[in-house]
């Protein structure tokens, strides 16, 4: 049985029992800010649903979903269970309530139960992500050629931007209350960009890109350096492909360190039409 959670006390003990679990802990609940955003405060949000899955009177699963009806989009913000029946029931719930929606799942790579059911539904996966957090930032790096986004570059930026993601260039431009965007400019041409949040105690780059012909010329380092400079005194975390050694070395050289046990995996699933 699935029931909407109305008070945090209904699920507090259940959620706490997953802390430190190597397979079933949730990378979206890795700190107090994420717990507040993705679980506690989500209970009162109209665009988020916190669902408890019960067997008899016992909770066997806890899930939070962001639901954007106008865009027919769902994102799992929390997924906690050690019981295959909970995953099966919540996926059936999505199939019943949100046919035709696009659904994203961000979860622990060790969660073989959820992955098994997503595999059966032909979900597509992004590469496993390594979490890194900022220790002492390396500041004072030359950032010539990098500047904050301005409207004169809107068309170039949106054309260059990765289209295969939720936060496209157009959406980032409209979300000035959430993102700062830094642009790498060469001869008045946008050759790279970095989108990064700025309203949190621990902010996060969402996308970093430099045109192929301008790579290995220091633009990626300059973009990151400018973002770190303007992020002071806040912290920063990021996710990088776990096998992308050059990018990991870049981030380590700028003051980031790997966080063990908090990698994540993202799956994309198209909920079938009825």
Feature annotation, model-predicted:
Residues 109-127, 221, 243-261:
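Conserved active-site alpha-helix within GNAT-family acetyltransferase domains
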Residues 33-90, 194-206, 212:
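Conserved donor-binding loop and adjoining core beta-sheet/short helix segment
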Residues 103-107, 205, 236-240:
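Conserved hydrophobic beta-strand within the GNAT/NAT acetyltransferase core sheet
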Residues 82-96, 210, 216-230, 248-253:
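Conserved acetyl-CoA-binding loop-helix of GNAT-fold acetyltransferases
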Residues 31-35, 142-206:
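Flexible, substrate/cofactor-facing loop regions flanked by secondary structure
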Residues 48-52, 62, 115, 129, ...:
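Short hydrophobic/aromatic beta-strand element in the GNAT-like acyltransferase core
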Residues 1-34, 129, 138-167:
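Short amphipathic alpha-helix that is part of the acyltransferase structural core
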Residues 70, 78-142, 265-267:
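Acyl-donor-binding surface of acyltransferase catalytic domains
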